[in-house]
UniProtKB/Swiss-Prot annotation:
Class of the enzyme per the UniProt entry, highest EC level: isomerase
Keyword tags: Cytoplasm, Isomerase, RNA-binding, Rotamase
Domain PPIase cyclophilin-type: residue ranges: 115-271
Name of the molecule in the record: Peptidyl-prolyl cis-trans isomerase E
Role played: PPIases accelerate the folding of proteins. It catalyzes the cis-trans isomerization of proline imidic peptide bonds in oligopeptides.
Chief place where the protein resides: cytoplasm
InterPro entries, A to Z: Cyclophilin-like_dom_sf, Cyclophilin-type_PPIase_CS, Cyclophilin-type_PPIase_dom, Nucleotide-bd_a/b_plait_sf, PPIE, RBD_domain_sf, RRM_dom
GO biological process, one term: protein folding
Record family assignment: Belongs to the cyclophilin-type PPIase family. PPIase E subfamily.
Region (Disordered) location: 77-103
Keyword Zinc among UniProt keywords: no
Length: 273
C-alpha cells in the first residue's frame, strides 16, 4: 500500500494461515512488535468473517476488508452487528404490529446460523447447520457462535463428540480434554444458566451440557429425540436446521454407554451469512 504521508509510515500486509489455533497464537506472541530490516511489525489475528456455504475466498482478497480492517488493531473492534430488517420489505402491514412484535420479528429474521463439518472415522460425513436463538438466550448463543468461529483464539475446530447415545443425544464441545471433563466458555470457565424458556421438544434441539446449576462452559449436546425431562435443567439455545442426516450418521456410531465406535470430529466450523 502507499505510504501514509501524515505519519510517514510504510504500510503492507502479509497473511499466514495455521492449521492449529495454538500455533497461530504462539506465532503472534513471538512476532508481534518484533523488528524486521529496521522496521517494527505488528502481528494479530485476521478479523474472522461470516462465510457463505462453499465460499473459500480469502478475506484479504476483498479490497473493502483491507481498507477497513487492515490497519486497525484487533483490540476494540466490534463484532458484526445483525442487519436491521426494513419493515417495508415485509409482506405484513407494520401498522398492525406493536413495537414489541416488531422487535421480535426483527430478531427472528436475524438469528445467527453456524455450521459444523463432521468427519466420522476417516470419512467426511457432511455439514450440520444450526440456528441460534440469540433473541431468547443471547449470552448462551453468543458463546456458542464465538466458539464456532474461533475468534477468541479457541473453539470447536477439531473438537470431538465424546459421548453419543442413540435415541438420546450427541454430546461434544470439550476442546480442552476431549473426554467430557474439560472445556471453557468465552466468559471464563463457567457461566450461569440464562433461562429455560426453550424446551427439549425433539430431534435437532441444541442444549448446554452442565454438571449442575450455573455450570455452563463449552460442552453442548444435540438431541436425537424429545428429552422433556431435561427442561428446566439444561439451557436450550438453538436447533439443527440442515444436515439432520449427518446427525443420524453420528448417532449410528454411538452406543448405550455413550462410547463412540469411530471418532466423530468437527473438522471445520464457522458462522454463515
Amino acid at each position: 500500500m502507499p505510504m501514509d504521508y501524515q505519519t510517514e509510515k510504510h504500510r503492507g500486509f502479509a497473511f499466514v494461515e495455521f492449521e492449529e489455533v495454538e500455533d497461530a497464537m504462539s506465532a503472534i506472541d513471538n512476532m508481534n512488535e518484533s523488528e524486521i530490516f529496521g522496521r517494527t511489525i505488528r502481528v494479530n489475528v485476521a478479523r474472522p468473517v461470516r462465510i457463505r456455504e462453499g465460499w473459500s475466498r480469502p478475506v484479504w482478497s476483498d479490497e473493502n476488508w483491507l481498507k477497513k480492517y487492515g490497519s486497525a488493531p484487533l483490540e476494540g473492534r466490534k463484532l458484526d452487528e445483525p442487519d436491521i430488517v426494513n419493515p417495508s420489505d415485509t409482506s405484513e402491514n407494520v401498522e398492525d404490529l406493536s413495537d414489541e412484535e416488531m422487535r421480535t420479528k426483527k430478531q427472528k429474521r436475524n438469528l445467527p446460523r453456524v455450521f459444523f463439518d463432521i468427519r466420522i472415522g476417516n470419512g467426511d460425513a457432511g455439514r450440520i447447520v444450526m440456528e441460534l436463538r440469540s433473541d431468547i438466550v443471547p449470552r448462551t448463543a453468543e458463546n456458542f457462535r464465538a466458539l464456532c468461529t474461533g475468534e477468541r483464539g479457541f473453539g470447536y475446530h477439531n473438537c470431538c463428540f465424546h459421548r453419543v447415545i442413540p435415541q438420546f443425544m450427541c454430546q461434544g464441545g470439550d476442546f480442552v480434554k476431549g473426554d467430557g471433563t474439560g472445556g471453557k466458555s468465552i466468559y471464563g470457565r463457567k457461566f450461569d444458566d440464562e433461562n429455560f424458556q426453550l424446551r427439549h421438544e425433539g430431534f435437532g434441539v441444541l442444549s448446554m451440557a452442565n454438571s449442575g446449576p450455573n455450570t455452563n462452559g463449552s460442552q453442548f449436546f444435540i438431541c436425537t429425540t424429545k428429552c422433556d425431562w431435561l427442561d428446566g435443567k439444561h439451557v436450550v439455545f438453538g436447533r439443527v436446521v440442515d444436515g439432520q442426516n449427518v446427525v443420524k450418521k453420528m448417532e449410528s456410531v454411538g452406543s448405550k454407554s455413550g462410547k463412540v465406535k469411530e471418532p466423530v470430529i468437527i473438522s471445520r466450523c464457522g458462522e454463515l451469512i
